[in-house]
């Protein structure tokens, strides 16, 4: 079996990507889920013009399967799949993006493909000492198997695969004193990472979850009642929410639902003083759901206090506390902003300083100021409570300006 070399500067570049581009190992799951989501997007997009594809939107999904015995973690999708040529082109050339090629070839800004740079797949090597990819393109007779242990290169062979889609099989590293790699085989850990980074990916992310049930043994006690025993039952469970509340139409979401979502995500049982729902389209498109809290949940101002706005790109969490979005005097504002137009750096971990983010921030601040002016005019007691809680922030802002 011939060993192929990566087409970029091999070992040095791969080491750079694994050890420098990504600063947080756990994001490997976000990257692989994003790739799987892209594959499902592509198959769905093709199915709109090719009825022979024979799959509906409801059929597409992503499956996560840990196996402690074999120490593997498998991410499976039933998306478009890849041919041998596409596999070598996309995985054999570091920093090449098949998703970007697909979007360019189809010349549509309406295709919400997450991947841009083609390096996310290689984040798997941060937690794996070997990665195996088994894939089959829709319409192809045979599947293809790609395998690599890292910078030494990779092998590509034909294989049998019944259905279109892709399996990414990670052979998880052994634990060290510094890192418990085996934690990435724990159901609770994987569910937490999906919830944190990929909860709003549009396709179902499914895991086989085991829970206990009481079932009859077939015997009866002396009173004629069935004797029960506890059994473990494993069943597929969707572990992501898929459609975020801010992406749903205003007519589908009540103010009470927004308030409950705020309370749950911010662990604040006080109703927010104001809710802002924003849907902007134009040069920069974005959706935002912002809240002015009913009390100071940071307990005062502090230079170390985190900002309250989370930033998403196409439903994937990019930054938990985006301090580049709003001025410090609005750090009490909570909520989310989701935009497909953000310019990210190569690892998607850090935003590049760009005009889009500045435009979004300026527009949001105008909306917040307008809401506060409306509150001051229409509900003076509520505004006075707001001022008591956050007036010092606004005063600091006046001084800074």
Model region roles, listed by residue range:
Residues 1-187, 192, 215-217:
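GHKL (Bergerat-fold) ATPase N-terminal catalytic module, capturing the glycine-rich phosphate-binding loop
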Residues 113, 131-153, 173-401:
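GHKL/Bergerat-fold ATPase module in large chromosome/replication-associated machines
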